[in-house]
Amino acid sequence: MTLLKNDTFLRALLKQPVEYTPIWMMRQAGRYLPEYKATRAKAGSFLDLCKNTELATEVTIQPLERFDLDAAILFSDILTVPDAMGLGLYFAEGEGPKFKRALQHEDDIAKLHVPDMEKLQYVFDAVTSIRKALDGRVPLIGFSGSPFTLACYMVEGGSSKEFRTIKTMMYSRPDLLHKILDTNAQAVTAYLNAQIDAGAQAVQIFDTWGGVLSDAAFKEFSLKYIRQIVAGLKRESEGRRVPVIVFAKGGGLWLESMAQIGADALGLDWTCNIGEARRRVGKQVALQGNFDPFALFGTPESIRTEVARILADYGHGSGHVFNLGHGINQHADPEHAKILVDTVHELSRQYHGG
């Protein structure tokens, strides 16, 4: 594989010295970019875009052509794994993802098993293709949803505001939910390891819905299974460490517990103070985040002010990857995203070196 020209992102995750704070943005390849919309129209549907190696490569690279980002992230969807389990993923216009066969009956849950990774070969082909297209420019991040977040969609049959169905199962038949979560954890471990084998240089586990759980439930039904995945991941590839980032939206309460599961970095949503988070867990893990995605709707001046505040809160030294606290909004102005990226690079140098 080609030598990396810019490994600042990987070094920051391992708290090695860097010259500036690296930045990438969750959902950086997405609907806020006109070029993404054009490619998606060419693909036909979102799922067709994910499954077309050439087009998935194209949209992964698009934000790097526009912004000076320090990492690329595989263009895919967290729901590829349950789709490979036979749940029948589809996207309803204006309603987001849905499953034809939600897991709400004991018989269906008993039949659930780890999918053959060959069913996800299109994802691994995309990873290899993107690495080739990047040609060592920046590292490539692979990713998956967490077992609990995947289970939310699998049990509810789509997205939910209340999570009533999965929470009912959690409190009335925890054995059934544990069966789903254990299967998901095994599947995600195999899936991320296959992404690493295909060329992913770091991986992120997205626990988007962990924050809806009580303290005890988060530890039993989410964190336990993320720990299981982290323990099973390949941590070396191509002669260097493959860092693992865990991002639990709404997980600021549990940073200490999350810092103990063996991940290299924790992602923070915008509700946390990153300086406080560093004082709490900065000796154990690097931190990623945590600019409010809606702060991009401010003025160029307010964006600079917010970047300066986050950088100052984190303070001197490595161990910070700048990111949004959640995915970039589809209505964000790409010019404002450029201001964000350039400002992070400009203002962060004072916190590194001598």
From Swiss-Prot:
Pfam families, alphabetized: URO-D
EC class of the enzyme, as a word: lyase
Classification via CDD domains: URO-D (cd00717)
PROSITE patterns: UROD_1 (PS00906), UROD_2 (PS00907)
Site features described as Transition state stabilizer, chain residue numbers: D77
Domain of life, per lineage: Bacteria
GO molecular function: uroporphyrinogen decarboxylase activity
Protein localization: Cytoplasm
Pathway assignment: Porphyrin-containing compound metabolism; protoporphyrin-IX biosynthesis; coproporphyrinogen-III from 5-aminolevulinate: step 4/4
Catalytic activity: uroporphyrinogen III + 4 H(+) = coproporphyrinogen III + 4 CO2
Family per similarity comment: Belongs to the uroporphyrinogen decarboxylase family.
Assembly description: Homodimer.
Protein's name according to its UniProt entry: Uroporphyrinogen decarboxylase
Native organism: Neisseria meningitidis serogroup A / serotype 4A (strain DSM 15465 / Z2491)
